[in-house]
Amino acid sequence: MSAVLRKPKTFKLRSLHSEKKFGVAGRSCEEVLRKGCQRLQLPIPGSRLCLYEDGTELTGDYFWSAPDNSELVLLTAGQTWQGFVSDISRFLSVFQEPHAGVIQAARQLLWDERAPLRQKLLADLLGTVSENIAAETRAEDPPWFEGLESRFRSKSGYLRYSCESRIRSYLREVTSGASLVGAEAREEYLRLVGSMQQKLQAAQYNSSYFDRGAKAGRRLCTPEGWFSCQGPFDVDDCTSRHSINPYSNRESRVLFSTWNLDHVIEKKRVVVPALAAAVHDAEGREVDWEYFYRLLFTLENLKLVHIACHKKTTHKLHCDPSRVYCTPAAPRRKRHARHRL
């Protein structure tokens, strides 16, 4: 049958260092390649298509034999792709010892009925691994620092800055909440925010959360820099087992910026308005600003969440009314003087 009369074949296409895929259809390898290059804004000369699974190059002879909805990798001149299982082998070679048994098990997974799901889970891991994972300075891993200002000399230093920037943005939102209270209460509101800012400054804006060199309990990652998604606000864990190591390579560093430090009890909808209401309704009571501080800036109310697990729906959670104000100190009992006999 003439290719012109055939129904276009559909594929899922992505570039070499991207997890994002999109659908493309065509009646020839050349048509699919042309559409893919246009979508990804890549040059057509020197580019080619390979099957994600095993690296087989998609040519005119093989085009109609490829399964529908096959996943393709678009390679430009000089790029190579040996397939998913070969990538596992490359990953394991970092440890400089043979893992033939694991490679064989990985091959079996490809034939398993759940292979697409397992491939994705393994790809999340493999895509973040680099043999420079232990490198820390700009001199040790120059590609990691591409696009960053020269003042960043270490990976940990940049990740601390990244975390601090997020926390500072939260503080700015809290400060802007002063508009929610009347003029008579605004001074008190800003005084409480000032206390929070002083505590944040003393804690370096909790920037240690992203620092793999920080002490356990002060960081969200392993000593090697691996972060795990903590799941949506309404569950205890991530069922997809999302993980990433932004210390491994530039692509993972950029991708990590899309992960969210999500407030379980929502910052803008709940916590900031509750703080404003507490100041307005204080009537002589002392607002427990440290309670609000923990909700706004600490892991008591923050979860690290992959973008796919970040639910933008209303959380329908509220602050604890019993913790909004400081508990009045109990009056000290007077001690009666002893009379000497």
Curated annotation (Swiss-Prot):
Entry EC number(s): 3.-.-.-
Keyword Cytoplasm appears in the UniProt entry: yes
Source organism superkingdom: Eukaryota
Annotated InterPro entries: CIDE-N_dom (IPR003508), DFF40 (IPR039729), DFF40_C (IPR015311), His-Me_finger_sf (IPR044925)
Quaternary context: Heterodimer of DFFA and DFFB. Interacts with H1-1.
PANTHER family linked: CASPASE-ACTIVATED DNASE
Function in brief: Nuclease that induces DNA fragmentation and chromatin condensation during apoptosis. Degrades naked DNA and induces apoptotic morphology.
Record protein name field: DNA fragmentation factor subunit beta
Source organism: Bos taurus (Bovine)
Gene: DFFB
